[in-house]
Amino acid sequence: MIQVEHLTVRYGDKVALDDVSVSIPRSGVTALVGPSGCGKTTLLRVLGGLMQPQQGNISGLHPAETAFLFQENRLLPWRTVLQHLTDVAPRHPAMAPRHWLSLVELEGEEESYPAALSGGMARRLALGRCLALEREVLLLDEPFTGVDPQRAQRILQRLKDLGKPVILVAHEPHLAQSCDRVVELK
């Protein structure tokens, strides 16, 4: 179980998270939902060790076991789709990248560069790159932005099938409802 206890994060005078406590199972897909500015991304960043809270603590999760998908795709324009995955695949560089391409439905785009991809395709490539890290816990910030709803549902099901804990920020109600649990931030 991942325990978040009395977490408070401020950006100057603005309070992003105020005394937030939540338990998140280390299995299945958990969606973080709520209005813009309620702290979903901030909570994800704290869980991933990318920022420190002013108060509170987290137990049951170490940043080294997480893979983080940022809201921005952060793709390298000079690397092909396949190279983006082979750069990070730790175990089976010849096999694993194609597996992740298949999971995010980018087969046939191996030699394409990011500039040739649609927004949804670039988002799926960023997700594939995150998956290729083969970390224990996936922290995904709006993983389906620009991805059509049917494809997003298929990929979400594949994420569930991985059997890893996934914590994602979801703005799409139908995707949040398809997750194993929903945590609402206000």
Task: Label the predicted regions.
Residues I2, L17-D19:
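Conserved structural motif at the start of ABC-family nucleotide-binding domains
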Residues G48:
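Helix-to-loop junction immediately C-terminal to a conserved catalytic motif
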Residues A94-E109:
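Conserved ABC ATPase "signature" region
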Residues Y113-M121:
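Conserved ABC ATPase signature
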Residues L127:
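Hydrophobic anchor residue at the start of the ABC signature
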Residues L138-E142:
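Catalytic Walker B motif of ABC-type/P-loop ATPase nucleotide-binding domains
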